[in-house]
């Protein structure tokens, strides 16, 4: 029974729960790795060893957080749980493929862990650039195992993307047009399209790297007519859409949370929100070389990538101001989920502003590969994606489990996390402006003060993570069941109660159009 339910599951709710648990566990591993990084950088001098082992930790931290925490939780967890409920579908379009998408991830994770256990580990950074990732600088199986790990995670995501696109287009009630589906459903569909179009390019790039390493091809070796810059183009053609893949489902969740706790029946500017997400998705594909301003591209090429990157700020601004407009005149309930959403809006906007700074190719020459970049993408990921995940988690926790979290603990947890992440990453802007480079385990002692403060912040964040584990335990131990959920008429996922039955919408749902 246990095996049939959890190993061979074809139920979107159970698979969503598996994704959530796996993502939470991977999040703990990723947090542990980040604590190792900040412990090493907490003061000058060496703690862990040389820069190779340090970069293995940094690389693993990135891969674990991106491919095994944010994506499984946002797309696999929230996506699986909420999309069928929100569109009134009985399940996903391909329930067994859904199960395979999940079970490809643990082996993928295993390969990534194995890569650090053999030889010297893969100390390449998450970008895996040759020639550093070639078989000379990284002899042995480490990088090969990392490449196989990425292949599996990529296949998992591509299958999941096909599943979500098919489900969302094909399994709505006949009366519902695409423009009547909730914004979270839109965000997942756009994310799935981005995955479907970008991951094959990554697969091509890392497969060529694999053959360069093992079969003496020279795709990225100038000695045989190849070019390492080609790898960078292939990687970032995936890598830039990837960062939008990480944030778009968060946009969808924040739209729902802000609308719900403002007491509104719909978000401000629904069509504008949809248009903005589609614009971000499209523009995300034509700005990749802003990661490569230092490789010596023509000035006109740099001018194009600078201006195209800045254009993304417009639809992003549409979203930020629409969230603020949604709250305007509302009866705002200061619930923990709303606090996460407000923290998201504030901190994501700061991260966006530093992104605008970095989009200037002239400035990026100086700031590239400094801690300014680290601060920028951790503001949008560690305080964008993660805050959205936390907000979504405390908002939909009653739906997933039938129990309620303790409001006071949840607010304390938010406060500790808010202080921790800001204390960790705000000083890194100063380090970057002062020229401290990334991916080094040691630094001149002029950088000590801000690094020490940053490391203190990371330990505050760690206490927040531990408190969250306690908070979830407390909810399951206390068993406070949900009495009633307000506003269900505009929040379809709640209509079956908390938690919903194993099978929902078994009969086709006919929903009367408001027009």
Swiss-Prot record:
Fe(II)-heme a binds at residues 61, 378. GO terms for molecular function: cytochrome-c oxidase activity; heme binding; metal ion binding. Heme a3 binds at residue 376. Mg(2+) binds at residues 368-369. Na(+) binds at residues 40, 45, 441. Binds 2 heme A groups non-covalently per subunit. Binds a copper B center. There is a cross-link at residues 240-244 (1'-histidyl-3'-tyrosine (His-Tyr)). Pathway: Energy metabolism; oxidative phosphorylation. InterPro entries: Cyt_c_oxase-like_su1_dom, Cyt_c_oxase-like_su1_sf, Cyt_C_Oxase_1, Cyt_c_Oxase_su1_BS, Cyt_c_oxase_su1_dom. Keywords: Calcium, Copper, Electron transport, Heme, Iron, Magnesium, Membrane, Metal-binding, Mitochondrion, Mitochondrion inner membrane, Respiratory chain, Sodium, Translocase, Transmembrane, Transmembrane helix, Transport. Its EC number is 7.1.1.9. Cu cation binds at residues 240, 290-291. Residues 1-11, 87-94, 171-182, 262-269, 328-335, 401-406, 479-515 are mitochondrial matrix. Belongs to the heme-copper respiratory oxidase family. Component of the cytochrome c oxidase (complex IV, CIV), a multisubunit enzyme composed of 14 subunits. The complex is composed of a catalytic core of 3 subunits MT-CO1, MT-CO2 and MT-CO3, encoded in the mitochondrial DNA, and 11 supernumerary subunits COX4I, COX5A, COX5B, COX6A, COX6B, COX6C, COX7A, COX7B, COX7C, COX8 and NDUFA4, which are encoded in the nuclear genome. This is Cytochrome c oxidase subunit 1. The lineage of its organism: Eukaryota, Metazoa, Chordata, Craniata, Vertebrata. The gene is MT-CO1.
């Amino acid at each position: 029974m246990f095996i049939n339910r959890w190993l061979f599951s074809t139920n979107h709710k159970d698979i969503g729960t598996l994704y959530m648990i796996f993502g939470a566990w991977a999040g703990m591993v990723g947090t542990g790795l980040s604590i190792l990084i900040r412990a090493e950088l907490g003061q000058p001098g060496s703690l862990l060893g040389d820069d190779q082992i340090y970069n293995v930790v940094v690389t693993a931290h990135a891969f674990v957080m991106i491919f095994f925490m944010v994506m499984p939780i946002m797309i696999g967890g929230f996506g699986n749980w909420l999309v069928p409920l929100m569109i009134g579908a009985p399940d996903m379009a391909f329930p067994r493929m859904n199960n395979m998408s999940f079970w490809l991830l643990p082996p993928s994770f295993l390969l990534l862990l194995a890569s650090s256990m053999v030889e010297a580990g893969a100390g390449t950074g998450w970008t895996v650039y040759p020639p550093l990732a070639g078989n000379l600088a990284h002899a042995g199986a480490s990088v090969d195992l990392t490449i196989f790990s990425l292949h599996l995670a990529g296949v998992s995501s591509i299958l999941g993307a096909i599943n979500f696109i098919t489900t969302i287009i094909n399994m709505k009630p006949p009366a519902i047009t695409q423009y009547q589906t909730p914004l979270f459903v839109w965000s997942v569909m756009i994310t799935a399209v981005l995955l479907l179009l970008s991951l094959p390019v990554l697969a091509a790039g890392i497969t060529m790297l694999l053959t360069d390493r093992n079969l003496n091809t020279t795709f990225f070796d100038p000695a045989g007519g190849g070019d390492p810059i080609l790898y960078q183009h292939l990687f970032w053609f995936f890598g830039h859409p990837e960062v939008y893949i990480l944030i778009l489902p968060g946009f969808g969740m924040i739209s729902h949370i802000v609308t719900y706790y403002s007491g509104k029946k719909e978000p401000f500017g629904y069509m504008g929100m949809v248009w903005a997400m589609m614009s971000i998705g499209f523009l995300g594909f034509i700005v990749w070389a802003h990661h490569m301003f230092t490789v010596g591209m023509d000035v006109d090429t740099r001018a194009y990538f600078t201006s195209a990157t800045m254009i993304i700020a417009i639809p992003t601004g549409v979203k930020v101001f629409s969230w603020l407009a949604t709250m305007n005149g509302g009866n705002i309930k200061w619930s923990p989920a709303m606090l996460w959403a407000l923290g998201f809006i504030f901190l994501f906007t700061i991260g966006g502003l530093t992104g605008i700074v970095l989009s200037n190719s002239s400035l990026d020459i100086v700031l590239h590969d400094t801690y300014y970049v680290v601060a920028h993408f951790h503001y949008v990921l560690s305080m964008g994606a993660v805050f959205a995940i936390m907000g979504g988690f405390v908002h939909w926790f009653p739906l997933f489990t039938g129990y309620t979290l303790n409001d006071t603990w949840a607010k304390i947890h938010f406060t500790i996390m808010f202080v921790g992440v800001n204390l960790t990453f705000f000083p890194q802007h100063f380090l970057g402006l002062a020229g401290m480079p990334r991916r080094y385990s040691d630094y001149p002692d002029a950088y000590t003060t801000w690094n020490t403060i940053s490391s203190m912040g990371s330990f505050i964040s760690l206490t927040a993570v531990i408190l969250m584990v306690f908070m979830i335990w407390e909810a399951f131990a206390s068993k406070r069941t949900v009495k009633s959920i307000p506003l269900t008429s505009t929040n379809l996922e709640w209509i079956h109660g908390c938690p919903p039955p194993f099978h929902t919408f078994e009969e086709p749902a006919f929903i009367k159009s408001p027009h």
